[in-house]
Amino acid sequence: MAGIEFKVIQNGDSDRRFIWLHGDEQTARMALENHMKKNKGKAFLVTGVVREAEFFGGIIDPNRIFSSEGAKENIQKYNRNWSRAKKREMLEIINKDRPMFLSKILPKNGGLLVALHNNFKGYNVRKEIGKSDATSIKKDQNFRDFYICTNRIDYDILAKSPFNVVLQEKLAKRDDGSLSWAAMGHGVRYVNIETRLGWLSQQKKMLNYLEKNLK
């Protein structure tokens, strides 16, 4: 995808898809690689080890390229010294590659796409509550560990879990290029499993709960 490389792990013929997009979120990578040893589906793992990927002599956030508007802002944010012509050319490359990449990572037949992320100081579920359609916040859970889902049936199931969960089922007025909005726009069920960096056991538990309870 626009020069951003991914390693693919496939186990069986399940239509379930998993993706890891930020190379500095190593806890999520370990949780996903461990999960794929015993569970069916196809996983896409970015090959870099930093948050921003190398991009034709510059850098780009791999989770802000899934719309033309988001990609344009992303290119401008990280590559301000580029000429207008180069920025336009790089945007055209992303726009050209996006449909094929989405066709590979988005499941068919009502399948589920699961993204795994880790957070650092500051970001937590409370920042998502204002733009969510429903929330289930558990008193004994850390605010930095939570699910974001885009399907109400999935939300109702995950709300019964021990973990925090929010539902975001309406498309944003401003598309920032994140995968969640692209999945929603294509009618694909999407869940993000967000945990603190370093809390591998927590992310494994949340991933296992999802695997056992979402079909």
Provide a role label for each language-model segment:
Residues 1-215:
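Structured catalytic-domain cores with a bias toward divalent-metal coordination
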